[in-house]
Amino acid sequence: MVRVVPLTDEEKMSIVSGLRSSVPATKLVTLRKLQEIAEVRPEAILYLDTYDKVTLNEIITLLNQIIEYDPDEILRREAMITLEKVKKALGTKFSTFVPLCNSCKSPIDLGWTYCTNCGAEIKNMTFEEEVERCPNCNNYISDSWKYCAHCGAKLKEEEEEVLRCPNCKRPVQPEWIVCPYCGYRLKRKP
């Protein structure tokens, strides 16, 4: 039997504040510490998932923010590595669903009409996980689709595109001339 040693409140606060820090060295040390915890004590991450989802979600959100917005490439890479190790510690929770043909068990794409391996019709198949169907044509659809690949029906309203600074990749307003985060000139004065 494995004895679970959960993260102390001090450790949790240290990780969250370290990931929020504006000092790159502090972020890097925190990322490495989190990697070590995920590798050496994965049960501590699982414990967080079970008993302190708020902190775990905050850690994952902060890692994603570093990956998306941090101007330092080394920190972005370390955050990606850390996130993968945390996901690995959490196990199958983050694995992606790949639909398999009911007849031949080959991987299929929900955009296909027939299995490319055996010719079975995909519309009539059932899957282990619940897969949405198009309200217009009743074919299976993917969560990420904006339009149905079978009939072209609109599935989602288009999200407003967020403008980002080409230099630091942070969100900027269209009327801004200079990025307030890094000083990059966004457009010329009229």
Curated annotation (Swiss-Prot):
SUPFAM superfamilies: ARM repeat. Keywords: Metal-binding, Zinc, Zinc-finger. InterPro entries: ARM-type_fold (IPR016024), Double_zinc_ribbon (IPR053281), DZR (IPR025874). It comes from Methanocaldococcus jannaschii (strain ATCC 43067 / DSM 2661 / JAL-1 / JCM 10045 / NBRC 100440). GO terms for molecular function: zinc ion binding. A zinc finger (DZANK-type) spans 134-183. Signal peptide: none annotated. This is Double zinc ribbon protein MJ0416.
